[in-house]
């Protein structure tokens, strides 16, 4: 099984894979799921998937949850799909590991 994230130490950037469920009761990251032998963090978002509302809420939620600037979070793949790749900029590896370990159960 591959990891659901990759870290580039020279650029201090990370790519994370998410399986997003919009129109949920609450915003929540809950462990991970395997789809076609690929792991994804499960992310529930309250916003509906219309006109970019869910994508905007994903960025807002991750920035608040992880105490990062919104400008350091970017959806780079899956804008109109539930499987998304998100780029996190300006993050050190220790902080990323702390984030990741808080969701692995």
UniProtKB/Swiss-Prot annotation:
<dbReference type="InterPro" id="IPR036591">
    <property type="entry name" value="YggU-like_sf"/>
</dbReference>
<comment type="similarity">
    <text>Belongs to the UPF0235 family.</text>
</comment>
<protein>
    <recommendedName>
        <fullName>UPF0235 protein RPR_04990</fullName>
    </recommendedName>
</protein>
<dbReference type="Pfam" id="PF02594">
    <property type="entry name" value="DUF167"/>
</dbReference>
<dbReference type="InterPro" id="IPR003746">
    <property type="entry name" value="DUF167"/>
</dbReference>
<dbReference type="GO" id="GO:0005737">
    <property type="term" value="C:cytoplasm"/>
</dbReference>
């Amino acid at each position: 099984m591959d990891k659901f994230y990759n870290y580039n130490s020279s650029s201090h950037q990370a790519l994370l894979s998410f399986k997003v469920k919009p129109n949920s009761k609450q915003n929540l990251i809950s462990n991970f799921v395997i789809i076609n032998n690929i792991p994804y963090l499960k992310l529930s978002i309250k916003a509906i998937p219309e006109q970019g509302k869910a994508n905007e809420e994903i960025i807002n939620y991750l920035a608040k949850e992880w105490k990062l600037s919104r400008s350091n979070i970017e959806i780079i793949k899956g804008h109109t799909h539930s499987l998304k790749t998100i780029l996190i900029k300006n993050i050190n590896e220790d902080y990323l590991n702390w984030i990741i370990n808080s969701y692995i159960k």
